[in-house]
A protein has these predicted regions:
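ABC transporter nucleotide-binding domains
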Residues: 1-162, 167-168, 172-175, 181
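A short local loop/turn or secondary-structure capping micro-motif enriched for an aromatic residue
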Residues: 46, 195-197, 236
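Generic alpha-helical secondary structure signal
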Residues: 48, 83-91, 192, 206, ...
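Alpha-helix N-cap/helix-start and coil->helix boundary motif
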Residues: 70, 167, 208, 246-247
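Short, surface-exposed beta-strand/loop "edge" segments at domain boundaries and coil↔beta transitions
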Residues: 128-129, 207-211, 234-238
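ABC transporter nucleotide-binding domain
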Residues: 145-230
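C-terminal coupling/interaction segments
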Residues: 217-264
Length: 264
């Protein structure tokens, strides 16, 4: 359930099912069971106009390499018709200094990704879905992409779902995090609440043995004892608990699980 006016970060290891979810939304795969609802309707019941309110941006590029920006824009304007916003397109092309006359084949990866995102935004979608859109980009290009997304989401009727292995990007922009593991949704949680609820604590063997085991999510052995992902509220105040990043929470839950009842 992606809330309007929010960004959902979709995380999980390779093979967890993130891209499969996106392919199901796109209609490239048939589901085995369950239903997918978008705009309050089953995805199979969406009209062509409603489908054009969804935009996708992928890690790979599908532009004819011998085209320039003007030719790509013309193709998209014909396809999207009344939904196409040339003013938005021209504004973003100018903002990011993309060359109108050069062939797409001469573009860097960062330039191609910016063009992909600009094209997606220029038919005024209500739902924007990105699959590894910042993968392989340098930090400056990634930051530019994140700025575009944050501008887009200022409209509270818009929503973004972004699947990424670069979890530091999601730390910056996501409102909620959905964690998928082996095809199972482990949690959907507010990002700030995740960081408030979980932490990492280093313990001697004696401290570990005396700790309330209900507080422990995952454990990693180290030279001096144990390092644990814990529920902060159950940890004694005399122990120093470090903040856990989203990446640490995911890795600990997958690799170092302590509580078998978590069913991860």
């Amino acid at each position: 359930n992606i809330k309007r006016g929010s960004i959902l970060g979709y995380i999980g290891e390779n093979g967890a099912g993130k891209s499969t979810t996106i392919k199901l939304i796109l209609g490239d795969m048939k589901k085995d069971c369950g239903e997918i609802y978008i705009f309050g309707k089953k995805i199979e019941e969406l009209s062509e106009d409603e489908k054009k309110k969804i935009a996708f941006v992928f890690e790979d590029f599908f532009f004819p390499q011998d085209m320039n920006i003007g030719q790509v824009e013309k193709f998209h304007s014909i396809y999207y018709g009344k939904y196409w916003e040339k003013e938005i397109f021209d504004k973003l092309i100018k903002k990011f200094s993309l060359p109108n006359k050069k062939k797409i084949s001469s573009f860097s990866r960062g330039m191609k990704m910016k063009l992909s995102l600009i094209l997606a935004l220029s038919h005024n979608p209500e739902l924007l879905i990105l699959d590894e859109a910042t993968s392989g980009l340098d930090p400056v290009a990634r930051d530019d992409i994140l700025d575009i997304l944050l501008d887009f989401i200022q409209d509270e009727n818009k929503s973004i779902m972004i699947s990424s292995h670069i979890l530091s990007d999601l730390e910056k922009i996501a409102d909620e995090i959905a964690f998928l593991h082996r095809g199972k949704l482990i949690f959907v949680e507010n990002k700030d609440k995740l960081k408030e609820d979980y932490g990492i604590v280093s313990l001697s063997k004696e401290e570990f043995e005396s700790l309330d085991k209900n507080s422990i999510i995952a454990v990693r052995d180290h030279k001096f004892g144990k390092e644990c992902l814990v529920k902060k509220e159950l940890i004694p105040q005399n122990l120093e608990v470090e903040n856990a990043s989203i990446e640490e929470i995911m890795v600990y839950m997958i690799k170092e699980k302590y509580d078998e009842s978590l069913n991860i």
